[in-house]
Regions:
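Core segments of cupin and vicinal oxygen chelate
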Residues: 37-39, 46-88, 122, 130, ...
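Vicinal oxygen chelate
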Residues: 30-35, 118-181, 187, 216, ...
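Short hydrophobic/aromatic beta-strand micro-patches
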Residues: 48, 107-109, 186-188, 240-244
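Eukaryotic phosphotyrosine signaling hubs
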Residues: 42-44, 101-105, 182, 234-239
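Bacterial N-terminal signal peptides
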Residues: 11-24
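Conserved short beta-strand elements that form part of the metal-binding/catalytic scaffold
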Residues: 65-100, 149-162, 204-238, 243, ...
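Bacterial N-terminal signal peptides that target proteins for export
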Residues: 2-13
Length: 282
């Protein structure tokens, strides 16, 4: 059912977009000049949860182990859930200062972070300076289009030797993961047309044929973002993960008592805070 309504929405939106002025130059904007510095793919998605321990336990039932966490006074304030050596979920607990659960940010992994940063600056964007973050990797951020909670916080990282992520390579890769790759992230936007224009003409993402709001990131990862109306998702996260064997994934979920809805070639799971996980075989 989710796929059915998404297809209807995209078809209607495609007709509307084709009627807008200026879109004839979109394809040309993708090929003019030097290609943008490539991304390796999605590095992580950050989500705030109401009960960190319960969320960690839920994702462990999906086969995703906690690689490490960050603590203050021996109390965890960030948990890193491992999908594969290059992709993680970052879970943050609610607090008195930050009481709202849901999607926080999306982070892209760059091949050369300084090259991406400098490319953005030359095109008039205003990323923060590249710095070394707490886990030991390079990082910069950029403000994006308006989401339900405010301007999107877009993160960019480059894994560095000796970082917590690099030191965990080959570890915490559970044999019973229900999926092994994060391939798409939905971004709820207040104005989908403005957000689409920003990602295509500012960040140089490429529109996917017949899916006007699905956009491939620069590089050869094939991973994508999906621009969706804020009313359809609110502050929830919606992630699409790739499973090599959906039948096996369904059996693993059943074994752990995790409810899943099957719709064609998609399994839909909801986490304790209502965030949506789509398992697909592509």
């Amino acid at each position: 059912m989710i796929r059915h309504y998404r297809c209807i929405y995209r078809a209607v939106l495609l007709l509307a977009l084709l009627a807008l002025p200026g879109l004839k130059g979109v394809a040309r904007a993708q090929t003019d000049g030097v290609p943008p510095p490539p991304f390796n793919g999605i590095a992580h998605v950050a989500i705030r949860v109401h009960d960190l321990g319960a969320s960690v336990a839920f994702y462990q039932k999906l086969g995703f182990e906690q690689a490490f966490d960050l603590r203050r006074n021996d109390v965890p304030y960030e948990s890193f859930i491992k999908i594969n050596d290059n992709q993680f979920l970052e879970l943050y607990p609610t607090s008195e200062h930050d009481p709202n659960v849901g999607f926080l940010h999306l982070c892209f992994e760059g091949v050369d972070l300084n090259a991406i940063h400098d490319n953005y600056v030359t095109r008039g964007l205003t990323p923060t300076p590249v710095r070394k973050a707490g886990a030991g990797n390079l990082l910069f951020t950029l403000a994006g289009p308006d989401q339900p909670s405010g301007p999107q916080n877009i993160e960019y990282t480059q894994y560095m030797p000796g970082s917590l992520h690099s030191n965990d390579a080959g570890k915490h890769l559970g044999p019973d993961r229900v999926a092994d790759k994060l391939i798409a992230v939905a971004l709820a936007m207040k104005d989908t047309a403005v957000a689409r224009d920003f990602y295509i003409n500012q960040l140089l993402f490429k529109p996917i044929a017949h899916d006007p709001m699905d956009l491939h990131m620069p590089g050869e990862s094939g991973q994508e973002v999906e621009i969706v109306p804020a009313a359809s998702l609110g502050t929830k996260a919606r992630l699409t993960l790739e499973s090599e064997n959906l039948g096996r994934s369904a059996r693993l979920l059943h074994k752990e008592g995790i409810a899943a809805t099957k719709n064609g070639e998609t399994l839909t799971i909801t986490d304790p805070d209502g965030n949506i996980l789509l398992l697909e075989h592509r």
